[in-house]
């Protein structure tokens, strides 16, 4: 099966290239955000707007019951919204520390995801948000293995998607 990992994050691209020899990696172009390792801007958005993605894996700076998933940078929010919109299946990946007051800009709500994966749900905040919003998202609580957590160090709010290449 041909798998292509699409990301705007240099750390994710490097990790995937080094550790997933059967996967192709598409690093989205764009403006490199100062002091971060990911691309944003109109070039990134233009490329994303042309892609059809099977699965999107999105992270967040914070989650708040009232405000949803938020991030600190507007350009990052735009990329996340596009990835979510272009994917058939959408996953939020977050740890419990992200349940906190909102960051600067909202990019999604629980209704935008098929699955939300976390290490645990503090005080049932995520489950309550899913129920209160009539969302269809599955909530999965999974403690990551220590080696998996340490394997890739990225800005904790980055995203990537997977698409299949069609031969011929």
Label every model-predicted segment.
Residues 1:
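Glycine-rich beta-alpha loop segments
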Residues 6, 10-168:
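Conserved phosphate- and dinucleotide-binding cores of soluble alpha/beta proteins
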